[in-house]
Amino acid sequence: MNDLMTKSFMSYVDLKKAAMKDMEAGPDFDLEMASTKADKMDENLSSFLEEAEYVKAEMGLISETLARIEQYHEESKGVHKAESVKSLRNKISNEIVSGLRKAKSIKSKLEEMDKANKEIKRLSGTPVYRSRTAVTNGLRKKLKEVMMEFQGLRQKMMSEYKETVERRYFTVTGEHANDEMIEKIITDNAGGEEFLTRAIQEHGKGKVLETVVEIQDRYDAAKEIEKSLLELHQVFLDMAVMVESQGEQMDEIEHHVINASHYVADGANELKTAKSHQRNSRKWMCIGIIVLLLIILIVVIPIITSFSSS
């Protein structure tokens, strides 16, 4: 059963064996009843694993979606035309929408699996429940990895957006912008009165306006993407709460399993000690009887001999 706790996914046969082993270890094990329960396990475990594989596949697709978002983001850093920036922004937005749809589907499926697990616990008892919950917990751990991957990408995109604005500022003015100026350009809808006035005086209105339009497009893209990413992030956060909650339940289950194994081990040791005491008691009893017989013989034989002589 400990193996079940440490593996994310197990085959159907392994799950069934683990659950059957738990039932056989129970105090009220009945062969006929176990056979009936095994038939029920055949039904619910096979369909359950199909659902688990579906969730696992969807999480794989989300990882692929994140990889494409990162690819489009890297491409956007090398383009300057408004049309190209807009095209890549649309691609990123579409990927985010797709990822959001998959994340919501996974969240819904995990909630359904949780409800089914609780029902299984009520109807079939803890062995099958622990088997199913262990697999569900493995899915959540995988989901948590995807969530951390997404969070890293989100932070990277917003950080590099500021770096892009800084580079464009340097291209126009020949100077490096400090954090305050970058924030001003971004929050003022790419205006930044000081930046615009100085740049127009030094480089002409046409070139500056072209750069400002590019920064504006990047700003619009960044805000739109950030809004979508925040929505996706909220879904991940909701599922993270589910991960922690189920993780605590799994820790409690594992704690009980470990305690049970300790109790069994302690009981076996106590039984072994009791048997040892019993053997020692019998040994000393035999020795006592033998000594008593020897004493009787030592006392009785001389008496008999004296009577015979007289």
Curated annotation (Swiss-Prot):
It comes from the Eukaryota. Disulfide bonds: none annotated. The gene is KN. It comes from Arabidopsis thaliana (Mouse-ear cress). The modification N-acetylmethionine is found at residue 1. One of its GO terms (biological process) is vesicle-mediated transport. Abundant in flowers and developing siliques. A low level expression is seen in the seedlings, roots, and leaves. It is found in: Membrane. Keywords: Acetylation, Cell cycle, Cell division, Coiled coil, Membrane, Protein transport, Transmembrane, Transmembrane helix, Transport. One of its GO terms (cellular component) is plasmodesma. This is Syntaxin-related protein KNOLLE. Induction: At or soon after the onset of mitosis. InterPro entries: SNARE (IPR010989), Syntaxin (IPR045242), Syntaxin/epimorphin_CS (IPR006012), Syntaxin_N (IPR006011), T_SNARE_dom (IPR000727). Interacts with SNAP33 and/or NPSN11 to form a t-SNARE complex and with KEULE. One of its GO terms (molecular function) is SNAP receptor activity. Residues 94-159 form a coiled coil. It is a single-pass type IV membrane protein. PROSITE patterns: SYNTAXIN, T_SNARE. Belongs to the syntaxin family. Residues 212-274 form the t-SNARE coiled-coil homology domain. Pfam families: SNARE (PF05739), Syntaxin (PF00804). SMART domains: SynN (SM00503), t_SNARE (SM00397). Residues 305-310 are vesicular. Residues 1-283 are cytoplasmic. The chain crosses the membrane at residues 284-304. Involved in cytokinesis. Acts as a cell plate-specific syntaxin, required for the fusion of vesicles at the plane of cell division.
